[in-house]
């Protein structure tokens, strides 16, 4: 309805609508949806549903997506032989809802973080559990007093050698139902703070004085600045919504069966006060491309249990024609003791950009498997489109001039360098020719 009106008013050209429809129909044709015979996707045999291969793939996705945000003095991985009692505390510790988010199917089995830790440790380690608080209400029981589960959480914390806090959100707090004011009913959350009494619970448990690993189960960014700065929180791992058996992956990550290697696909801000209103379509402060502010965790950031070294970053030449592709080379080496899946990132910035143009933008990424001590050369080719900027008229233009290309395991910002202790390599190349329009 609105698109039809926009077309009538000359706000959208009919050819633009046609191009969008053609793309949509192209995908449907390639999926076999327009054929006379039934699509193979409509006749998947039931015996492949939740088959061992799919379960293994789901578990691998859980492992690959986890992002290690903090790991003071290499506190993780935990050494089970040194732990007699572990306390698992928090509203998401034994929550199935926190595993799957929304748009999920029904699994034949769910493994929560609590269950994953219990299964991994077996009888060798005593596992204590306390819910601590409701996900967002002041009490767990309907007729309970406020903070009705705090005491049991503190008792468990006092008796533990290590505490695993499981906090965050679930689809009941963040979702796609209704408008931004529909928090707690599957709408958009109103802020970045941990909801309900979760922050207060975290601070109360930290006051006990035992080392804490904070695992966050959520589908979006949260303000974890207190946990990042507090010395008692030794490690923070963002597990997102890890899937039906996600608790198994969380336990294996905590105890070092593999190293978390994920990188953040979003920016974690410390607050929303400086962000523009939702109806303000200027890009100032929106995403890593348009902000120069200090952020909590930058886009592209993530730690591992290993150590990765980048060296010999270069391009074959430094001068390129306006529509010439640019191939970037870099050597990546795993100098640590854990195999990793490193995400090599390439960012591009036009040195002569206008104030409203974006800064560094991720234009190339390559996932590289590295065994301990292994070294690989990685080549990433950037197309002319990767150097283009969008004009105020909506045209996709490549400009002649100087470009900066940053290569490494993170974005080229001061905060990432401070968090990881590493820097990226910056190359300078020149595009020669005239301003040229390219396809989106």
Locate each region found by the language model.
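Conserved, charged catalytic cores of large soluble enzymes
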Residues: 22, 26-45
């Amino acid at each position: 309805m609105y698109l039809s009106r926009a077309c009538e008013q000359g706000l959208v050209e009919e050819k633009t609508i046609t191009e969008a429809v053609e793309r949509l129909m192209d995908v449907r044709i390639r999926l076999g949806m327009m054929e006379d015979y039934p699509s193979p996707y409509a006749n998947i045999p039931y015996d492949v549903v939740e088959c061992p291969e799919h379960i293994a793939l789901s578990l691998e996705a859980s492992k690959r997506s986890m992002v290690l945000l903090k790991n003071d003095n290499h506190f993780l991985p935990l050494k089970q032989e040194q732990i007699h009692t572990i306390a698992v505390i928090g509203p998401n510790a034994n929550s199935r809802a926190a595993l799957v988010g929304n748009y999920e199917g029904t699994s034949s089995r769910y493994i929560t973080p609590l269950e994953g830790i219990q299964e991994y440790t077996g009888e060798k380690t005593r596992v204590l559990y306390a819910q601590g608080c409701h996900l967002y209400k002041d009490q767990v029981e309907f007729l309970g007093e406020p903070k009705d589960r705090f005491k049991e959480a503190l008792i468990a914390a006092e008796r533990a050698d290590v505490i695993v806090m499981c906090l965050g959100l679930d689809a009941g707090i963040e979702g796609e139902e209704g408008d931004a004011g529909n928090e707690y009913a599957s709408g958009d959350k109103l802020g970045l703070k941990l909801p309900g009494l979760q922050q207060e619970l975290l601070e109360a448990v930290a006051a006990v004085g035992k080392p804490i690993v904070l695992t966050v189960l959520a589908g979006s960014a949260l303000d974890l600045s207190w946990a990042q700065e507090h010395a008692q929180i030794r490690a923070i791992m963002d597990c997102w919504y890890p899937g039906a058996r996600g608790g198994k992956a969380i336990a294996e990550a905590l105890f070092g069966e593999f190293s978390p290697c994920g990188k953040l696909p979003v920016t974690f801000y410390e607050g929303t006060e400086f962000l523009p209103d939702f109806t303000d379509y200027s890009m100032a402060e929106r995403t890593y491309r348009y902000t120069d502010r200090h952020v909590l965790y930058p886009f592209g950031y993530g730690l591992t249990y290993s150590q990765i070294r980048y060296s010999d970053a270069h391009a074959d030449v430094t001068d390129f024609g306006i529509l010439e592709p640019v191939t970037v080379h870099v050597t990546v080496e795993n100098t640590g003791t854990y195999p990793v899946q490193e995400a090599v990132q390439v960012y591009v910035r036009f040195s002569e950009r206008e104030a409203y143009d974006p800064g560094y933008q991720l234009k190339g990424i390559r996932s590289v498997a590295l065994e301990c001590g292994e070294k690989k050369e990685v080549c990433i080719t950037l197309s002319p489109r990767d150097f283009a900027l969008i004009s105020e008229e909506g045209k996709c233009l490549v400009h002649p001039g100087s470009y900066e290309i940053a290569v490494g395991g993170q974005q080229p910002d001061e905060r990432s360098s401070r968090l990881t202790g590493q820097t990226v390599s910056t190359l300078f190349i020149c595009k020669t020719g005239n301003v040229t329009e390219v396809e989106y």
